[in-house]
Amino acid sequence: MLDAFSRKAVSADSSGAFIGGGELASLKSFIADGNKRLDAVNALSSNAACIVSDAVAGICCENTGLTAPNGGVYTNRKMAACLRDGEIVLRYVSYALLAGDASVLQDRCLNGLRETYAALGVPTGSAARAVAIMKAASAALITNTNSQPKKAAVTQGDCSSLAGEAGSYFDAVISAIS
């Protein structure tokens, strides 16, 4: 996993150039948004259990067959595995958001995910829908527009770009599952 700084250094080194111009401007922006980035990751990690359980409850409400006998989350064991997988996905999305780089998500979470789910008989459409629900909840928390009474204390300013960045990581998960 490379953070934004390491990526710029590796890129400049491979071309035998100094870091300057546009690279410095993007790093300056990354630093300026550092507190917002930390607050966004804190909002996700502090609300992880709610984000994941709401997503799983959402797919169960949308598709009641999932909780019926032979459904994807029928037994307690399957439900626990579904919640665990959701927390793992959210954790790696938060790592990627913190680093400003999706490589940790790609390398440690998404590689072979579709094949694993297929081998286990996990309904990929439902899994992708759960991730989409997590994406929406995360965007609301990051932009501090969630409707829950306890909103996260975040650094003032527009966090829509961070919500979009997190959304792109969730989209990568959805693509890997589908």
From Swiss-Prot:
Protein name: C-phycoerythrin class 2 subunit beta
Reported modifications of this chain: Contains two covalently linked phycoerythrobilin chromophores and one covalently linked phycourobilin chromophore.
InterPro entries, per the entry: Globin-like_sf, Phycobilisome_asu/bsu, Phycobilisome_asu/bsu_sf
Biological role: Light-harvesting photosynthetic bile pigment-protein from the phycobiliprotein complex.
Organism listed in the record: Synechococcus sp. (strain WH8020)
Gene Ontology annotations for the cellular component aspect, listed alphabetically: phycobilisome; plasma membrane-derived thylakoid membrane
UniProt-annotated binding residues for (2R,3E)-phycoerythrobilin 2: C159
Keyword field: Antenna complex, Bile pigment, Chromophore, Electron transport, Membrane, Photosynthesis, Phycobilisome, Thylakoid, Transport
Localization annotation: Cellular thylakoid membrane
Residue positions binding (2R,3E)-phycoerythrobilin 1: C82
Chain sites annotated for binding phycourobilin: C50, C61
Principal location class: membrane
Subunit structure: Heterodimer of an alpha and a beta chain.
Keyword Transport among UniProt keywords: yes
GO biological process: photosynthesis
Membrane topology: Peripheral membrane protein
Sequence similarity: Belongs to the phycobiliprotein family.
Disulfide bonds, paired cysteine numbers: none
